[in-house]
Amino acid sequence: MNKRWTEHFKADLPTFYDATRKFYAKELKPAEYKGVSGGFGCYGERGGETTMIRLRFTGGILEREDLIQLREAIKKYNLKFVHFTTCQSVQFHHLKENQILGLMMDCYEQGILTRGAGSDFPRNITAPALRGVDPLEYFDITELVKEAADYLLSFIGVVELPRKLKVSFKNTGTNAPHT
């Protein structure tokens, strides 16, 4: 799924790169930068000297290859602050210009999506971490989570949605994902 969307959203990257270069050159105010960068899952951090990027992993699904790519990115860009979020995304903080520009391209080359991870776009879909192995689950919802994410990604840049639209699935009678 992500590979298809990363190829689709690559066409938007020049807009992000231009805004990011202007932000670091102080030609774009933080609020103006946020208006562009937020849709790419990237935000200027307090003080306007660094940025944060949010990587989408639908339902918190991190495959072995994803973990290897994250490890390599951490080494390559000397990343010091990695945050695994409650929305089952991964964030890298305190990024300088060369780090964010290179990292963004590497993510898209590896099929890791950032588009729509912020701003007025559907956020990462969350789901219970134990789906597929939880003895109390009604059925494994993983494929439904992936299909729903694919559907919501199709709205990016096409339909105006409510701010921070969040979708979560659950697979048992409990409220494990806090839906």
Predicted regions and their residues:
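Small-residue-enriched alpha-helical segments and adjacent helix-cap loops
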Residues: 25-28, 50-179
